Amino acid sequence: MSASELATSYSALILADEGIEITSDKLLSLTKAANVDVEPIWATIFAKALEGKDLKELLLNIGSAAAAPAAGGAGAPAAAAGGEAAAEEQKEEAKEEEESDEDMGFGLFD
C-alpha cells in the first residue's frame, strides 16, 4: 500500500471516529494538513467506496469474519465420524457460511 493510500485510509478512520461524513474534500483536507501529497482520485475512490457505510461496523465485522472459518473447519472431522445426519448438518452449515460471506459490505464500487 502506498503512502497516499495509507494516508487516505487513516483520514477516513479519523473522520469515522469523529462521526463526520466521509467525503473526498474532507479526506484531502486531512491529508494536506498532514503534509502528504495525495492525488484527488484516491480521495474520490475512498469516499465513494465508503459512501453510506458505517466504517466502525465494517471494522467490527472483520474480526467476526476471520473467526468463522475456524469454527466451520472444526466440524469436518465430526461430520465424517457422525454418519449421514452429521454430513447433512455439515452441508447446511457450509451453505449458511457461504450465504453470510456473500456480501459483507466490502465492495469497492457498491
UniProtKB/Swiss-Prot annotation:
Main location: cytoplasm
GO biological process, one term: cytoplasmic translational elongation
Keywords: Cytoplasm, Phosphoprotein, Ribonucleoprotein, Ribosomal protein
InterPro entries found in the cross-reference section: P1/P2_N_sf, Ribosomal_P1/P2
Keyword Cell membrane annotated: no
One Pfam family per UniProt: Ribosomal_60s
Comp. bias (Acidic residues): 95-104
Listed Low complexity bias regions: 69-85
Disordered: annotated segments: 69-110
One function term, GO molecular function aspect: structural constituent of ribosome
Example of a GO cellular component annotation carried by this entry: cytosolic large ribosomal subunit
UniProt subcellular location: Cytoplasm
Job of this protein: Component of the ribosome, a large ribonucleoprotein complex responsible for the synthesis of proteins in the cell. The small ribosomal subunit (SSU) binds messenger RNAs (mRNAs) and translates the encoded message by selecting cognate aminoacyl-transfer RNA (tRNA) molecules. The large subunit (LSU) contains the ribosomal catalytic site termed the peptidyl transferase center (PTC), which catalyzes the formation of peptide bonds, thereby polymerizing the amino acids delivered by tRNAs into a polypeptide chain.
Comment field (misc): Yeasts contain 4 individual small ribosomal A proteins (RPA) which can be classified into two couples of similar but not identical sequences. Each couple is distinctly related to one of the two A proteins present in multicellular organisms. Rpa3 and rpa4 are essential for cell survival, whereas rpa1 and rpa2 are not.
Family of this protein: Belongs to the eukaryotic ribosomal protein P1/P2 family.
Assembly information from the UniProt record: Component of the large ribosomal subunit (LSU). Mature yeast ribosomes consist of a small (40S) and a large (60S) subunit. The 40S small subunit contains 1 molecule of ribosomal RNA (18S rRNA) and at least 33 different proteins. The large 60S subunit contains 3 rRNA molecules (25S, 5.8S and 5S rRNA) and at least 46 different proteins. The acidic ribosomal P-proteins form the stalk structure of the 60S subunit. They are organized as a pentameric complex in which uL10/P0 interacts with 2 heterodimers of P1 and P2 proteins.
The name this protein goes by in its record: Large ribosomal subunit protein P1B
Protein species of origin: Schizosaccharomyces pombe (strain 972 / ATCC 24843)
